[in-house]
Amino acid sequence: NITGYYRLGDYDALSASLRYFSLGEVLTSMDADAMTIKPYEMAFDIAYSRMLSETFSAGVALRYIYSDLGYSDDDETTPGSAFAADIALYHNGYINIGGHESQLGWGLNISNIGSKISYDDGNTSEFIPTNMRFGLSLLYPIDEYNTITIAADANKLLVPTRPTMDQYIEHMIETEGGTAADYENNFSDYRTWLEGEGYFNVSPISGIFKSFGDAPNGFKEELQEIQ
């Protein structure tokens, strides 16, 4: 990682970073036709942050993502790229608890709001991991020399649920008959079914809103997605 920042004034700053991640050499399988791949990813960020008041600040970041799965001998697999943005808010104030001035802070970050990424020269596109995170913290002074801090955060992935292979198999049995064994290895047909279901046609912004109500098992599963 390479990072740096520049203060524009007393209340705002610019920052930039370059990240590179490599998995090294990876053997795709133990079969005779296995190949060795060298997947890697890199991202370049530029961000602006500003203190809007004594207790409130905000920041935005723009990001370029490049991802290469390393299948150099596979004409069907190409490197993917995407653009994304982050939005962050932070508030830090004071409240009175039992006669003690306590510090209460909260923060919200929505990251990777942006385009999809394709590894097959644009034929199909996948969602990048848009994520929302919200956190709270309370600092309470016990006495003149000691304080206690309580903090918690919640995380939610903002991408629509991808229809599973099991759903595809169930659909095929209902419409075409047969057994699960007839369809469980039909990955190309499964992908064609995904296209028919419109999964690849959902825009990134629509996917964010769709992610709040598309869990197969309803609201209970939506709550389980919050970590």
Predicted regions, residues:
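Subset of outer-membrane beta-barrel
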Residues: 1-227
